[in-house]
Amino acid sequence: MKNVNLFAGIILFLSLGASPQVHSQDFGPLLVSSTPLPANLSEYVLDFDRAVELGKALFWDMQTGSDGLTACATCHYSGGADTRNKNQAHPGFSGNFTRLGPNATLTPSDFPLRKLADPDEATSAVIWDSTEVIGSQGITKQDFNSIDLDFGGDANEVDDCSGIPDPLHSINGTNTRQTTGRNAPHAVNSIFYVDAFWDGRARSEFNGVDPSGLGNPNAMVRKIDANGNIVPCGVSMNRAALASQSIGPPLSGVEMSGLGRNWNDLGKKMCSVTPLALQTVSMTDSVLGTMAVSPGDGKGLTTSYVDMIQLAFRPEFWNSDAIFDNNGAHIGNGTPEGPNQFALMEQNFSLIWGLAVMCYESTLVSNQTRFDQYLAGNPNALTPEEENGMDAFYSGGTKCSKCHSGPLLSAATWGQLNTDTDVGIGPVVSVGTNADDGFGDKGFFNIGVRPSGEDIGRAGVGDQTWASRYFNGSTSALPGPVHPDETISGANKNIGAFKTPTLRNVELTGPFMHNGSQATLLQVVQFYTRGGDFTHMNPGDVHKYVNPIGKLNNKLPRQEAMVSFLKALTDERVRWEMEPFDHPELLLPNGHFGTSQAVAEGGVNSNEALDDIIVLPAVGAAGRTEINHPPVKGFLDTPSGAPANPIGPLGGGNLDPITELVCFEQEQKIVLNWNANTNISSYIVEVDNGGIMGVETFMVSGNQTTFEYNTFRPKTTLYLVTPYYLGMELKSAACFVRQGLTPGTLTHFLRGDTNLDGMLNVGDAIGLLEGIFTGALIPCEDAADWNDDGALDVSDPISVLGYLFSNGPAPAAPYPNCASDPNHDQLSCNQANICQ
């Protein structure tokens, strides 16, 4: 409840001057053909399809981790993200855990990490605040000694490592798995980013050795020249950020590796193990199925990584008997012996890994969403609530699409780099903040999640940011030209800026933000409603498009409509892990046996906690339904909406002040009906249409429970009803009507009139029973759906008979007059003029 000046808001008719709506139809659906890949990929990759096979195997293989359990997929297993709920906390900037800790189990009540008394007001009382981050657990802290080879030269899945005491990630002296200081970005659609990681430190120009691209001029691989000699070879591949990104985590002492492991070590290990030897692979896997070991015969693939590499890569990068030492020096020819001698294939493993994983991830494109159907011309692909949320998303009132632009809904993608958008053209752009103007890298924005000094984000990339390269005169190292219309002056605004992520499949990829601070999409919408958490403290750092959104403030139905739109960005193939999102089995460490106060020992090294393992079963091309497995769930499996809002003495106990709000088209007008559950002085009815929230506003007396609106508005309109009592704003409710592009489009019917004779009688029950049990035609399914639950079942004819003969309840609206269906569902009417 909030105090308001009723007289300032009571206007019979108000047309708002708003910026023009940005229509989503300004671009088309996402096309697989637009997937960016390096132009010179064929100089290294011999067979793209074989490279995809190799990349998928490497991405999912747990043997890549020094612990024999941590794969790339471990942090990207669920819709491309990491939704584990135990041992995921990192202390963040302060270096000390405050509310959470090692092995803590996350619950919905832990979020958001900055809790305010009013989630729509950034300056309201702070209930709690923490620098903590929800990251991804990697491996325990340990030094790498060597890979562990047996006498036959086969590698153990667990490396020879020595545990290191870890005062940060431990409980009573027992080490727990370390956790990253940022939340894991989701992998699906990541091929489209210009630079990768939250700060973009994985560069678009791949150097074959590390993530830094042109930032490492000494990066070299080895190659066989035309004369058969082994020579150093620089690698330069544009549009290859995923190759740069993929070679970071495997050597990270937090994520996957013992400290000190090198790429030739990992190459030797993987060339000495059976691919996916610890994991079942479905015989119907869309990529690996033909190589999968038959059920009952073991696990893994029937081939070797050596064979897979030879089929995928050009021979000049592996076909040699040269032997190299730990430092990459050519020390002879023949067969490498022991863990410290390496073949050319093993010496070039960073190149092989990076390109193979990039090729695999380039196939993970989710372009079969209902949003894509809408963009392709299907106006009914979205529900009315989703369409209204989309209109708000693309409106000048919220400014969401300024940064979340294009078919990927991200300004950090190749398709948006040189596109004229409201956040600039080209890699280096003018950046307006809430205080002054400056410059920064396009697609990276400070949105006020935390104080800028806690994590400087893009600025941490140093002299390799695009802005720094531009000022250093290294314009040839930019991913595109700087546009002459951009004013590049003032302060550097890369401080605290992070990559704008795609919003596709976002309902599955929580927790949200670079620090994992929001658990639900509603919390994200409320974050933007209040204009970020620290905009008022760091106005000179936070982008000008992040500021309070008044029309969303205390208007939960509008916020929920935006959440509904975001859910329409989910590709059902991702939800059900259908091709190309199928995968091998994966054993997932989800914290340790015990609590945040005490853990059981039992890790690989002494003084390490015993892992609590979750088994993700292997899935084939047909997805989870093939193995009778439920769909992928979001983080904590938390509903995106808010719980029921008890509003105290003014709200009638636990009931909302108004309930059962419905709206429908009746004759040439829109009718709203609702129930009032408490004393109400007045109502404000707002009409949202075309992306303008409150295009018209009306005052209604508190003793009314109905409202009529006589203006036709095309497409979808939201009707927001906000009750007031003694100057206090209570919880609002909303309903939606989609009237089409022209008047008279909606079908009108009388609820319960199954046979369309204009009245309710026993014939309606008989006709409905025949339809349910014999398949007889039901001319208007909506009319037959007595309780408007979106389904036809035996309860509907029973309710008809109960109403006719036993004084049972009347049907849902529309009744007793003909009108349109108040609720959007999958039922339909085969006749358009039923009531005429």
Write out the residue ranges for each language-model feature:
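Pro/Thr/Ser/Gly-rich low-complexity, intrinsically disordered linker/stalk tracts
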Residues: 652-679, 728-746
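Periplasmic c-type cytochrome electron-transfer domains
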Residues: 20-654
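Short strand-edge motifs at loop-to-beta-strand transitions and within beta-strands
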Residues: 705-707
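Short beta-strand segments within Ig-like beta-sandwich modules, predominantly Fibronectin type-III
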Residues: 697-703
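Extracellular low-complexity, O-glycosylation-prone stalks/linkers
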Residues: 679-697
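Bacterial N-terminal signal peptides
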Residues: 8-17
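Beta-strand-rich modules
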Residues: 709-729
